Amino acid sequence: MAGTNPRAARIAALIQRVIASSMEAQLHDKRLANVTITEVRVTNDLQIAKVYWTQLGHEGHEQGERRRAQQALNQAKGRLRSLVGTKAGLRLTPQLEFIFDEVPGEAHEIEDILALAHKRDEELAKSRANAQYAGDADPYKHDEPDDDDFDDDDDVEVEDWDDDDEA
């Protein structure tokens, strides 16, 4: 792809500019009104250009609008390729493949999830502000000697065990 070949990267940037400006100026298709070209990747042999696009759509109508925009891009593919060839001055103009870019939509979903997590963290911090620990201040049990079992005054007999007695 364009990352390994500097010439392919330059041509990809040129194709992106040409297609984006041509969609506004020369293609007067209402289906392409909210279409944005996000990235173009060109193979190292300059034969294929993958054009990634996204669409700012209305909630609920995105699938239908996306399908109509894809049809409009496919119908305009020949004209756009011709414009790219004219502006780029290449011997062979790359074949254009239009691919819907899922990344902006997924990024928006991730941002929503992170915002929800941040909101829950704030709520948890508020509930912890006035919280108190349950139970005693010192939750560990300590062994206290009972006075009834053993007194210091009691004499304790200790038997001596010799190894000779056992044999």
Swiss-Prot record:
GO cellular component term of the entry, any: cytosol
Stretches for region Disordered: 127-167
GO biological process, one term: maturation of SSU-rRNA
Cytoplasm found in the keyword field: yes
Keyword annotations from UniProtKB, A to Z: Cytoplasm, Ribosome biogenesis
Biased composition (Acidic residues): 145-167
Highest taxon, organism lineage: Bacteria
Subunit structure: Monomer. Binds 30S ribosomal subunits, but not 50S ribosomal subunits or 70S ribosomes.
Protein name as annotated: Ribosome-binding factor A
